[in-house]
Swiss-Prot record:
Gene: NAD9
Function: Core subunit of the mitochondrial membrane respiratory chain NADH dehydrogenase (Complex I) that is believed to belong to the minimal assembly required for catalysis. Complex I functions in the transfer of electrons from NADH to the respiratory chain. The immediate electron acceptor for the enzyme is believed to be ubiquinone.
Localization per record: Mitochondrion inner membrane
Annotated protein name in UniProt: NADH dehydrogenase [ubiquinone] iron-sulfur protein 3
Source superkingdom: Eukaryota
Similarity field: Belongs to the complex I 30 kDa subunit family.
Keyword set, alphabetical order: Electron transport, Membrane, Mitochondrion, Mitochondrion inner membrane, NAD, Oxidoreductase, Respiratory chain, Translocase, Transport, Ubiquinone
Any GO molecular function: NADH dehydrogenase (ubiquinone) activity
Organism from which the protein derives: Patellifolia webbiana
């Protein structure tokens, strides 16, 4: 079975309310779904005889601040039986919680923690939803587009106190003007 057959079969078999949009391309096939049907759709893709997407490769987050549902969560799946890949996408806002898929794919625990830590997207029924890449006292979610580049606090080791301290960031210069014109590219009109 080839990738296009699996994709077409899935589209024809699935309840239409589970899938908002489909996209076929040479880079891979994609289903867009509502958060309400995410778990059911992943169950179908993993357990059905003609799909068998039993490997969850990755879960990624993307932030689009101009959208109403600004966060996109992307699930990349692999069927080793049929040598096929598929991408499943859903979107959420700051308060929408997405169903955890740890019961279906145990490895999802780490990736869901990463998406929560970096973007603030929360997962319902996750067994251990806590920070994974940032410190426990860290405030905010650093991969959001509205997170300041310099962060909110500076964490450093204080040698006299022999401990790690967190202090508010103090900028010595609030605004910097960068001249992007290269002096090497300036030419006067007399050169031939």
């Amino acid at each position: 079975m080839d990738n296009q057959f699996i994709f077409k079969y899935s589209w024809e078999t699935l309840p239409k309310k589970w899938v908002k949009k489909i996209e076929k391309s040479e880079h891979g096939n994609r289903f867009d779904t509502n958060t309400d049907y995410l778990f059911q759709l992943l169950c179908f893709l993993k357990l059905h005889t003609y799909t068998r997407f039993q490997v969850l490769i990755d879960i990624c987050g993307v932030d689009y601040p101009s959208r109403k549902r600004r966060f996109e969560v992307v699930y990349n799946l692999l069927s080793t039986r049929y040598n096929s890949r598929i991408r499943l996408q859903t979107s959420a806002d700051e308060v929408t919680r997405i169903s955890s898929v740890v019961r279906l794919f145990p490895s999802a625990g780490w990736w869901e923690r990463e998406v929560w830590d970096m973007f603030g997207v929360s997962f319902i029924n996750h067994p251990d939803l806590r920070r994974i890449l940032t410190d426990y006292g860290f405030e905010g979610h650093p991969l959001r587009k509205d997170f300041p580049l310099s962060g909110y606090v500076e964490v450093r080791y204080d040698d006299p106190e022999k401990r790690v301290v967190s202090e508010p960031i103090e900028m010595t210069q609030e605004f910097r003007y960068f001249d992007f014109a290269s002096p090497w590219e300036q030419r006067n009109g007399n050169e031939g």
